[in-house]
Amino acid sequence: MKSPVLVWLGFSAMCLGMFVAILDIQVVASALTNIGVSLDIADDSLSWIQTGYLTAEVIAIPLTGLLTRAFTLRWMFVAATVGFTLASVGCALCDSGAALITIRVVQGLFGGMLIPPVFTSVFILIPKERQLIATTVAGAVAMIAPWSARSSAAI
């Protein structure tokens, strides 16, 4: 039996990962104009920064179940977190539009792998009598992330 404190701590960390992945979508959407000016990206190419990320994320979400079965929930989530973090650093270091679009696709793949494990963990780790609370927390985190993005993009 796992310690309830460790289970909730792990669940909270997973919620934070999901929050950042969802937040990233909205923050970048808010900053697209500034990104385009900074990197001298044409308007028709600028949309690919978001499109590449979102397409990769949508592809990664259903693959997460397969990856979880192959590598376990813990290791898949850790790998996704490390990959997302490294891709985020890569995005910050990009000096061209093509490089940014490419790294955003990679970031989207890892970002997509940060969302489903939160809800999977509710049914695997959380005791049945606490699953409603955990699902509510996860849903609230998923809803608060895009809402809070506008103010964090301004920073």
How does the language model describe each region?
Residues 6-64:
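Extracytoplasmic
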Residues 61-155:
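Helix-loop-helix hairpins in multi-pass membrane proteins, especially solute transporters
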Residues 1-7, 92-93:
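Helix-boundary and loop/linker segments of multi-pass membrane transporters
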Residues 2-5, 13, 42, 47, ...:
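Generic detection of intrinsically disordered/low-complexity segments and helix-coil linkers/edges
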